[in-house]
Amino acid sequence: NYIRLRVWNDPYDENGNGYGGGNNDVATAITLGQRATQYGMKVCIDFHYSDFWADPKKQFVPKAWEGMNIEEKSDALYNFTLENLTQVLDAGVDVGMVQVGNEINNGMCGETDASNVRKLLASGSKAVRDAATASGKDILVAVHYTNIDDMKKLDTLLTGLQVKEIDYDTVGLSFY
């Protein structure tokens, strides 16, 4: 069994007030992840790569990454993933899976161009693999879509990942 814990980049305004919705920063993920680990559950870290909810209609770039080109954003995403996942692992959380992006049907982290989204996915996946190697853990990489009723569209999305050799292990699908 897994518990899925979302992580937002910086869910606080300029005065340090949380946006609400749980203020799911890495510290919160560590606290909840330690509790889940204590009870024998594996943890899936769900990086939204946004300061608040990311879904098919809202894939806003984090404040700290605004104005970055795709190369800079890709590097920032790699570093954010590696640093935060390492913190979670160092805190003793039993991470078995990391979700790179949340509900990325129409884009990710402010990017809508498919090649840019794939570049971000590749950076996130590499960061997960690097953190897993450093910690000696086997951690699955997941990509996540939602409400895809058309199997042809899902096939197109997944074929795009395979053709571009994006490194992932599993696909998460949410339906509401």
Sequence positions of predicted segments:
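Active-site cleft segment of glycoside hydrolase catalytic domains centered on the general acid/base Glu
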Residues: 19, 25-27, 54-160, 166
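N-terminal substrate-binding region of glycoside hydrolase catalytic domains
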Residues: 1-38, 42, 48-76, 172
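Flexible loop residues that form catalytic
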Residues: 8, 103, 176
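A broad "ordered helical/assembly scaffold" signature
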Residues: 45, 49, 114-117
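Residue-level signal for short, function-critical loop segments
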Residues: 9, 145-147, 174
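Hydrophobic faces of well-ordered beta-strands that scaffold small-molecule active sites
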Residues: 3-5, 43-47, 96-100, 141-143, ...
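Histidine-centered active-site/metal-ligand motif
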Residues: 48, 129, 176
